[in-house]
A protein has these predicted regions:
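Cytosolic ligand/metal-binding cores
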Residues: 27, 43-46, 185-257, 337-381
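Contiguous alpha-helical scaffold segments within structured protein domains
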Residues: 78-100, 139, 200, 208-298, ...
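An anion-binding catalytic pocket shared by soluble metabolic enzymes
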Residues: 134-223, 316-344
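Conserved hydrophobic core element of enzyme catalytic domains
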Residues: 263-391
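Acyltransferase
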Residues: 388-422, 595-619
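Pocket-forming structural segment of enzyme catalytic cores
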Residues: 489-499, 504-508, 512-604, 608, ...
Length: 619
């Protein structure tokens, strides 16, 4: 079949150019067939191309504005491949014009939203980072199938480094884009995720290693990427049978910009549809922790997200009959209606160091990048020759290697359980799936682990009956806000386990703050949130490099420290009185996250803590 036949064939179609690992060439794949809707991911067929909207995250019980965007699947009746050069010859090459154009949320309004998120959400302990979207809107007069194919051709010609370049035409809606980022890939039981964060936008005169090195040394960019690696490791530890391994960092070079990225790999025995469900959706397009990020998105964004930050998902089977899944994140994508209305959603990642004006500029640059790549907005003249690969510069390689050395070695290799500690730990999840990573860390010390959410029926009784250590895990929110039912319950639970549980309790981040409050220490809001910060501290007399994700902290002065010491309780604190850790008969608490990739020796810290708790009696 000739690609030009798609102009007259009324059936839905998809054209995909995928970067398939292990293949030297990456042809254009053509899928033609009917499109139908489904309610849940579990209803997807074994083979087909799914369009997964952001609202589908409701399957995980997360808050989301339901805009009615359907979960669709194209079931191929015909499929074939075309070499790239042949596809370029046969696809329409005419110019596509966009009229009007502007953001649905103005610059001043968006800057105000950014400021509120920084102050109220990140400053209020609701999370480490959040992605807030606005949408560039315009109109393509007389839009039709030929225009969709012409836009796809422009992307094939002008973009490089994309993971998927695609056009999907459902009959009444067209998605065309070049996504740089894997949502999740599964083949032969191996699951791969690809957290990307940090963007070096090429200057008008072109990219240089010197400019790139400045970008690679930017602390804000480093923290952004580290935070999303942690967030996606949470997902990998949920779907992976033995956790995950961090590969990288690497540089992803595209036509107009470059990104820093990692790859996460793990083994999974789950069904591909379950893997897809448990990985909805990446922190790079939501925030962290993801569940609370969804609440923040619902509170601050205007309207629903449609397919933005959702995923395409190509399901199939390999020659041996094993399930396969290949899924890019739906970013850098134009969503075009049958009436020619064009929507280009873009988001900025807000972290503690963000400036509202800078994030406004970021969304302008991202929208312009998509429209330029599509050829509907003028860009810089194309270079006469291919740009040199920046990643080949020895200084760039050294800078990337330096970032890797700042990650916990535990997460850089496949892990096997040790036999340092025996028993069964019960982990209480306070709405942050850092507990999945924490459980993996605990298993690595030799413990069996069960994770239960704080709001599960019967949790309090289960905790008191548990004959092993209890871990009060992390979670968003203000630990002093007893008007919050979650905090009221967790505060009471902390009091109960300290008094009545006889097998030891460890508090992590929020759990630590709850224990500290029960010890009589003051809990205060930090002047500057400490979200995604890697710092060297003195931990009970020895130096440790650890990762913090907190907006609140316990404070302890000299007098309070002496009083606690008289009761056998040690306090590890900074010079300003902020408490890093506490430990006493039958309990311990750490403000930092030992399970984070930012804590270099977290497994040893947890192993030592559990060893001290073993057989101890609570106060």
């Amino acid at each position: 079949m000739d690609l030009r036949d798609l102009l007259s064939d009324p059936r839905p179609f998809a054209l995909l150019r995928r970067r398939v690992p292990g293949r030297a060439e990456h042809p254009v794949e053509v899928l033609i067939g009917p499109v139908g809707s489904r309610d849940r991911l579990a209803e997807l067929p074994d083979e087909g191309l799914a369009l997964v909207p952001f609202r589908q995250i409701r399957e995980r019980g997360f808050d989301v504005r339901d805009d009615g965007t359907p979960l669709l699947v194209l079931t191929p009746e015909e499929s074939y491949e075309i070499p790239l050069d042949e596809a370029l010859r046969r696809l329409p090459a005419h110019e596509v014009r966009v009229e009007g154009g502007g953001f649905d949320v103005g610059d001043e309004e968006y800057a105000g939203i950014v400021g509120r998120v920084l102050k109220e959400e990140i400053g209020g302990g609701e999370g480490a980072n959040f992605v807030i979207r606005r949408t560039y809107e315009g109109e393509i007069p007389g839009f039709g199938r030929a225009d969709a194919l012409a836009l796809f051709r422009r992307l094939l010609e002008g973009e490089r480094g994309a993971y998927w370049t695609f056009v999907v035409h459902t009959g009444d809606r067209t998605l065309v884009g070049a996504s740089p980022e894997v949502h999740v890939r599964m083949s032969g039981g191996t699951v791969v995720m690809n957290p990307i964060s940090g963007t070096y936008r090429y200057p008008a005169e072109g990219p240089t290693p010197e400019h790139l090195l400045d970008f690679l040394a930017d602390g804000k960019e480093i923290e952004e990427l580290s935070m999303v690696v942690d967030e996606e490791l949470k997902m990998m530890c949920t779907v992976g049978d033995m956790g995950g391994v961090v590969v990288g960092p690497r540089l992803k070079e595209m036509a107009h910009l470059a990104h820093t990225e990692y790859e996460l790999r793990g083994k999974s025995s789950l069904d591909a549809r379950e893997v897809l469900r448990e990985t909805m959706f990446a922190a790079t397009v939501t925030g962290s922790p993801v569940q609370n990020a969804c609440r923040v998105i619902e509170r601050h964004e205007v309207g629903g997200r449609g397919y933005y930050a959702g995923a395409l998902a190509l399901l199939g089977r390999d020659a041996g009959g094993t399930q396969t899944l290949d899924s890019p994140i739906l970013i850098r994508t134009a969503d075009i209606g049958a009436d020619g209305r064009l929507r280009v959603p873009v988001g900025a990642t807000l972290v503690r160091g963000s400036e509202p004006a800078g994030e406004v500029a970021e969304t302008h640059a991202k929208a312009a990048g998509v429209l330029t790549a599509l050829g509907v907005r003028p860009g810089r003249p194309r270079a006469e020759r291919e740009l040199p690969r920046l990643a080949d510069d020895p200084r760039v390689r050294a800078a990337l290697d330096g970032r890797r050395s700042a990650l916990a070695p535990f997460w850089l290799r496949m892990q096997q359980p040790a036999a340092e500690v025996s028993g069964h730990a019960l982990v209480v999840d306070g709405e942050d799936t850092f507990t999945a990573m924490l459980a993996h860390l605990l298993r690595a010390t030799g413990l069996a682990v069960t994770v239960r959410r704080y709001d599960e029926p019967g949790l309090r009784a289960a905790v008191l009956a548990h004959e092993g250590p209890v871990v009060l895990g992390p979670g968003p929110g203000n630990p002093s806000d007893l008007a919050d039912p979650k905090m009221r319950f967790l505060r009471e639970l902390a009091r109960t386990v300290l008094r009545e549980h006889r097998h030891g309790v460890l508090g992590v981040c929020l759990g630590h703050e709850l224990l500290a409050a029960e010890l009589g220490l003051e809990i205060v809001r930090k002047e500057v949130p400490y979200q995604g910060a890697q710092t060297e501290i003195e931990l009970f007399g020895r130096p440790e490099t650890v990762g913090f994700y907190n907006s609140f902290t316990a404070r302890c002065d000299e007098e309070a420290a002496r009083e606690l010491a008289a009761h056998g309780i040690e306090v590890s604190r900074a010079a300003n009185g902020e408490v890093h850790a506490v430990r006493g008969p039958g309990f311990a608490g750490v403000q930092f996250h030992p399970e984070s990739v930012l804590t270099l020796d977290g497994v040893a810290i947890v192993g030592e803590s559990m060893g001290r708790l073993r057989g101890a009696s609570a106060v």
